[in-house]
Amino acid sequence: MTGQDDLEYAIYLLTFVQELYCKAYKCLHQMEELRKFINDIYPMNDVDWNFFSSKLEKETFKKNTALVKIGRVENYLSFISKGVIRLYIPQEENELTFGFLFENQFVTAYDSFITRTASDYEIETLTDTTLWRISFDQLQEVYNKTESGNLIGRRMAENMFLIKSKREVSLLNKTAEERYLDLFSERPRLLKEIPLKYIASYIGVTPQALSRIRRRIT
């Protein structure tokens, strides 16, 4: 090899190592975010965390990718490292959107996941999305082999139930404008990435009515 070849090869190696370092650092940061989220539910010791994290798989999905389809069994509990996700029921005329999930939240078709039966709704990505996922069988292993696994699982189930209850109470007690403001106050930046037709469906109005609401409050 010539001196020029040596230099080019050295630059290539340096670039490759830098890319590996950046990817490793990014993964480490994402895992730290997940551990913080879980510790807020219930503190997990290092031994349990290492066992749990060894079961996680990182997956990336393009925008508008179906994660769960009607009639299919949900096999994963996923933590959203990056992205926006929609839960909805397909209908002949209009889809019924009943949930949005964002970064640092869990997503799963939970009823299908725990009962091992077909899902009655669908889940899709609204943006390019990164998930940390654990399968049903691997989660059962975590429950069986760690001290804190079962308690964390119960707390996560309670958290999902509270989110569902909050949504139902909102539909019964709040106006469409109040529901929109609630969603806007939660994630104002990410809300811009959700098509208005899905937001309209979520708060229970037509797209035209949503446009009027947006004009009134801006």
For each of these PLM feature ranges, what is it?
Residues 57, 84-88, 106, 130-131:
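Short beta-strand segments in beta-sandwich/barrel cores
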Residues 16-57:
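Cyclic nucleotide-binding regulatory module and flanking cytosolic helices
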Residues 67-72:
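Short phosphate-coordinating micro-motif centered on Lys-Gly-acidic
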Residues 144-146, 164, 186-191:
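Basic, amphipathic alpha-helical hairpins
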Residues 15-18, 174-218:
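Phosphate-/nucleic-acid-contacting segments
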